[in-house]
Amino acid sequence: MGASPVALTPLTARARRTLARPALALGWVAISIAALPAITGVSLSPTARYAPLVASAVVFGMPHGAIDYLALPRAVTGTVTVRWLAVVGVLYLVLGGGYAAAWFFAPVPAAFAFVAITWLHWGQGDLYPLLDFLDVDYLDTRPRRAATVLIRGGLPMLVPLLGFPERYRSVVDAFAAPFGGSVGDLAVFDPRVRLWLGVAFAAATVAVLAAGRRRTHSPGAWRVDAAETLLLWVFFFVVPPVFAVGVYFCVWHSVRHVARAIAVDGSVHPSLRAGDILGPLARFGVEAAPMTAAALALGGVLWWAVPNPPTTLESGAALYLVLIAVLTLPHVAVVTWMDRVQGVL
């Protein structure tokens, strides 16, 4: 890949600012506010802890992937055709259907596969805005980008295990429970294993950031990268996992991908150049609505099909996350395709 510029989205500087500023700032502000109860010792009720996750069904979370049927063809060719709709449909049918079946036959491996897939996807979800919105100059090779994906994805997926091992175990166990599975006492929950994981991941975080600082000619962008990384380290270490992941999913990961999906829609570029973000956002909402509704209907089918249907808020939220898992695998395929076309990978 070398040091050649990244061929991301063809936006003017004004249009890029219109997208980037709210997409980045919303995450910074929301994460900071959401950390306050934990930092000040306030205990949230179960309803409050699960509220962001429940809200994600309609607020950015589910919709950010529901736009795949349009985002992929727009990124690849700039136009949407029946052929492209069929391509995305087949991706979801084959990958999502296969993964859904895996939950019924091997729920515990499927649950940990979800953690691994999400680690990759949330890492790649932060790579794009670093390159396009912050214009970092030190992620100029695939190994450096892969290292950043490893760190950024590990913040929401690994750090909660370090800070809240028992809650982490209960969440993963709740994934498998509707399908008759149980996590049990795996080595990853052993205190010594977690200690070594924490030391290794902290060292890797410092090493990746230090390497970027040595290479950058734009220290301001690097400082934002480092500040985001530190913010997320603290957030996921001190905030209970379900609440932390729900907030992050809604207002950090999903919002940044929504901005990316808007960026590949050429019809809204004039609005972005004029400084208008509300019009493009409304268009996104309309376009994402049909597939969001279809995904929620699929959730109802999943609820009916599992051997042990949920009876509590916790188990219901866990099954919702299984639905997210089933949809995440084909979504990762779509985003990876976009990454290849746009020069991110």
From Swiss-Prot:
The EC number(s) given in the record are 1.13.11.63
Alphabetical UniProt keywords: Cell membrane, Dioxygenase, Iron, Membrane, Metal-binding, Oxidoreductase, Transmembrane, Transmembrane helix
GO cellular component terms, semicolon-separated: plasma membrane
Mark the transmembrane ranges: 24-44, 52-72, 85-105, 111-131, 146-166, 171-191, 192-212, 231-251, 286-306, 318-338
A Pfam family of the record is BCD
Q: Which cofactors? A: Fe(2+)
Q: How does it sit in the membrane?
A: Multi-pass membrane protein
> Matching HAMAP family, A to Z?
Beta_carotene_diox
Q: Which family does it belong to?
A: Belongs to the Brp/Blh beta-carotene diooxygenase family.
- Protein name per its UniProtKB record: Probable beta-carotene 15,15'-dioxygenase Blh
Organism encoding this protein: Halobacterium salinarum (strain ATCC 700922 / JCM 11081 / NRC-1)
